Amino acid sequence: IRKFHEAKVDNQKKVVVWGTGNARREFLFIDDMADGCVFLMKNFNPTKKQNEQGEIFYNLGTGKDVSIKELVELIKEVVGYKGEITWDISKPDGMPQKLLDVSKMNKLGWKYRKELKNGLAETYNWYINNKIDLKNV
């Protein structure tokens, strides 16, 4: 977000992003993470058997992934950057996919609330209202 904001403000013609953009990642807004944790504390009381069998692990997530290309396009749109995106394929993509199985949380009755684009917009608004000179950090 910062990189695209600075490119917009400085009228840069392009933003360079590492990798091919093909890797896929899952993103969860922090408010949803907090809500999911509280939900588990209130609604999940494992039995001794569940504890012994290791059935106490729950993934908090959306269960949906996006490519880094899709993410970058969303950020570009949210920020209002009009330049081009250049992919530096000499840099690594990392793991091809990171996606959680959230079916156990869904069975308990919990689901995330904030869609990725809305979360990015909220994060960008926060950044605009609270930014500091991050170039020197």
Tell me the role of every PLM-derived stretch:
Residues 6-137:
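C-terminal substrate-binding subdomain of Rossmann-fold SDR/epimerase-dehydratase oxidoreductases
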Residues 3:
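Conserved AAA+ ATPase "sensor/coupling" helix adjacent to the nucleotide-binding pocket
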